[in-house]
Amino acid sequence: PQEFAIYDLNEFLSAISLFSKPELEFENDFVMITEEGTSTSLKYWYSDPSVVTTPTKDITMPECEVKFNLSSDTLSTVTKAAAVIGAPDMALESGSLKVTDKKNDTANNYALDLDVDSQSENYKFWFKVENLKLIQGSYDVQVSSKNISHFKNSTGNVEYFIALEPESAYNA
């Protein structure tokens, strides 16, 4: 494993998404992203670590109340729908995902059902769509009432801890 700093994670993930089958080769000062079977490449320079804020300790995921699998297709569809209707927010509520603008009662929204493992049907967890820029793939997702979620890539060694919005509620 190569430790390196990225100044703009969204830009880095967007750069990777330019390739359908990206291969990453980590050098001392940059990562070379290439497309399997082609001559296409992108050189992405690492950031100076002194300008990047890093956590001071490891994140410990508290007990989670809701679990589900987010397929690559579902993730892509939901983020595309959010972009199309200009929805900045996503709600996980009683087994469905909905993108909308929570500050506007008459905002357009897009929703789909999920197969969710939860002991309660009475919850509403809010995410900012801008925080869901993830490397393409399927994710095993755990959500805690302590306003944190854990997205673990089903096939790779990639995981994200994504904060929930303060309006999130479990058994409310």
What are the residue ranges of the model-derived segments?
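DNA polymerase processivity clamps
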Residues: 1-45, 61-172
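Short, well-ordered, aromatic-rich surface patches in folded extracellular/luminal domains
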Residues: 45-54, 58
